[in-house]
Amino acid sequence: MAGGTQGVAAIVPAAGSGQRLAAGVPKAFYQLEGQTLVERAVRGLLESGVVDTVVVAVPPDRTDEAKLILGREATIVAGGADRTESVSRALSALSAGVSPEFVLVHDAARALTPPALVVRLVDMLRAGHAAVVPVLPLTDTIKAVDANGVVLGTPERAGLRAVQTPQGFSTELLLRAYRHAGVAAFTDDASLVEHVGGQVHVVAGDPLAFKITNRLDLLLAHAVVRG
């Protein structure tokens, strides 16, 4: 990216198949009470008032459909074979314009994330933190288990958090993390940043930012939207 920095961009990797959801379409294109999950995710970002640009990575055979659905609300790119490649392609698409100061990465499956959470995240970035993720405290007891199903121990729950999205980063730090990603498997972008020595801070998450992964999640999402 070149040409100075400006504003906040958001990337929405939405190229997954959604096999666990078993909805018959890629998960991001599932219709939740009249709007696809990706529409809801993008509009939640924009309604925050702190996101200037959105880039969405979708399955290559769904780019035309995504452009029709999202119109001028987002730039559409063909996603890659996995989440990391999809985000990398979206980062490349951002290089066509003025480099944003910050980049948020948000799961389309967290379609009901409140705009207020996005605002809290960006406020933390603007306060000087280069990497910020929303989290919730755990309510279940967690067990460490080996490959044979034997419990190895019980981590202290007070120091553990469940991580949500959007996750926010300075553009420079996120680009550096992706340049050094290699072939290792990372489940979120904060993990890549940790891999290159970045310090990640947390901000209060929101129960509505839950990830829609299975049929039970869908039932909850429909109930929330219906009120």
Swiss-Prot record:
Its EC number is 2.7.7.60. GO terms for molecular function: 2-C-methyl-D-erythritol 4-phosphate cytidylyltransferase activity. The keyword Transferase applies. The gene is ispD. It catalyses: 2-C-methyl-D-erythritol 4-phosphate + CTP + H(+) = 4-CDP-2-C-methyl-D-erythritol + diphosphate. It is an enzyme of class 2 (transferase). Keywords: Isoprene biosynthesis, Nucleotidyltransferase, Transferase. The record marks 20, 27 as: Transition state stabilizer. This is 2-C-methyl-D-erythritol 4-phosphate cytidylyltransferase. One of its GO terms (biological process) is isopentenyl diphosphate biosynthetic process, methylerythritol 4-phosphate pathway. The record marks 157, 211 as: Positions MEP for the nucleophilic attack. Pathway: Isoprenoid biosynthesis; isopentenyl diphosphate biosynthesis via DXP pathway; isopentenyl diphosphate from 1-deoxy-D-xylulose 5-phosphate: step 2/6. It comes from the Bacteria. Gene3D superfamilies: Spore Coat Polysaccharide Biosynthesis Protein SpsA, Chain A. InterPro entries: IspD (IPR001228), IspD/TarI (IPR034683), IspD/TarI_cytidylyltransf_bact (IPR050088), ISPD_synthase_CS (IPR018294), Nucleotide-diphossugar_trans (IPR029044). Catalyzes the formation of 4-diphosphocytidyl-2-C-methyl-D-erythritol from CTP and 2-C-methyl-D-erythritol 4-phosphate (MEP). CDD domains: CDP-ME_synthetase. It comes from Mycobacterium marinum (strain ATCC BAA-535 / M). Belongs to the IspD/TarI cytidylyltransferase family. IspD subfamily.
